[in-house]
């Protein structure tokens, strides 16, 4: 079965947008694909129920319920291990793996979006996003910012992933100026040189995005 594990160098770097764009590409190619957020903190209350905001973005591409798109929906917008404690929920990694295996019975390609970065704890410090990626055996896509500071964040994320023996398919950098400035160009060069991992996607800055913008444009691929 095919899939990717999408992680990031930080929270709010664009993982959900990248996941949705990749999902759109797969669906447009008539590949049976879905996106899945194992643990979602910061649930939103709408129309009398809690909604998973990232799964709501996936719904702009495919018809997916919160139950299919997320195993643990937590209310407090903080690290999953703490949000689970506040909500009185125990995160069971085996349940997440079983959920992915269930999705693989229906879909040919599964995109798994992590929470925050790769060192984010799911169960205190005993089980991190990196451990979950190990269990699922999907290659990583690392989403990084294009701006100043990204070299350090991205190199550390790559080295941490390598320490866990994780395969990295590539880095997607998000939030470039149009056209890219000299600093951003140098960020790409140094990240590739220092990590030996290719930057496979370059996404321009967007203040927000609509249904029509959730599409992977060919000029973003590198």
From Swiss-Prot:
UniProt cofactor(s): Mg(2+)
Compartments, record wording: Cytoplasm
E.C. number: 6.3.3.3
Highest taxon above the source species: Bacteria
GO molecular function, one term: magnesium ion binding
Gene3D superfamilies: P-loop containing nucleotide triphosphate hydrolases (3.40.50.300)
GO annotations of cellular component type: cytosol
Recorded metabolic or biological pathway in which this protein acts: Cofactor biosynthesis; biotin biosynthesis; biotin from 7,8-diaminononanoate: step 1/2
S-S bonds: none
Positions contributing to ATP binding: 12-17, 54, 113-116
Lyase keyword on record: no
SUPFAM superfamilies linked: P-loop containing nucleoside triphosphate hydrolases
UniProt protein name: ATP-dependent dethiobiotin synthetase BioD
